[in-house]
Amino acid sequence: KVVGKKNSVVAMGAMGYITGIPVFCDSGFVVLSPISRALAQQSNTSLAVMATALSGGLYATHCLVPPTPGPIAMAGTLGADLGLTILVGLLVSIPAVIVAIIWAKKVSSTIHIEANSEYTLEELQKKYGKLPGTLQSFAPILLPIILIGIASVVSILGATGAVANIFTFLGKPVVALLIGVFLAIGMIPKQEKKNTLSWVSAGITDSAAILAITGAGGAFGQILKALPIQASIQGLSTTGLGIFVPFIIACIFKLSMGASTVAMITTASIMVPLMETMGFASPLGRVLVVMAIGAGSMVASHANDSYFWVVSQFSDMKTEEAYKAQTGMTAAMGITIILILFVVSLFV
């Protein structure tokens, strides 16, 4: 409604941007791909265009904005203020989404893929029945972010007293996110209540993997501290590369291992002892390092990344087409962000 049917590519990017904040990009793409397909068919646009815009929107906030597991783990590891990390992440990810939309229109538009949607947009709306209103739909996402933001402001101002303590408690990430979960559960239609337990079980299963990765990343960081490689990395920190150091390290892990979350957590663990040496010990400096690692973890989504195959398979792309659309786009997004961060770091 806001952007209109003519700007449906922008709508897909914006939809991905919002959905990627609390949801893994892989899961978000699977859930939203029927809408992408239906919009592509309705607007007579190549499915590759819609898929690229959606993928980029999801990827930007997945890599940069807590409470997605990777960014929130980085913020905790590096001691970055969570509220400030969310605010900066939301702002920095906007240029990344714009890059994704431009890439979709200029590059992915050369890839012709028929949408062949099983449902029209109207049929999808009818299939899901009456859905919650706009405010209700956004509440489980926005309320935790607002609570975390208020807690950060209280901390910065050094406020004390009962009210300050209440907001500090409610703004703790675990508490704020739990409130969001309860809000979401409260909006489940009666006929779907029977599925609640299976959804919770699936969520616990997914989070267990993240906890294991976080723990392994921390342990790996401690191992690296005891190895000669740490001295090499510290030497790299004195080369004047500044904000590019965490970006480069994250790129190496991303390209070699494929998983953005693993690249983020591992790089954050390596960067901990280098923060003061590199001059990133200030609150904003720590957040910039989180953003730089997030940008590096974007470069680039290719064949060893599960997200690459999710996007290609659910968008009917051939492998070479996915390299052109997905890999090229994610590389452009990450490079754009690090250049922006470099300019900002000159004034911090």
Please place each PLM-identified region on the residue numbering:
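Short amphipathic alpha-helical coupling elements at transmembrane boundaries
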Residues: 1-4, 34-42, 126, 198-206, ...
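Long, contiguous bundles of hydrophobic transmembrane helices that form the permeation core
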Residues: 87-199, 315
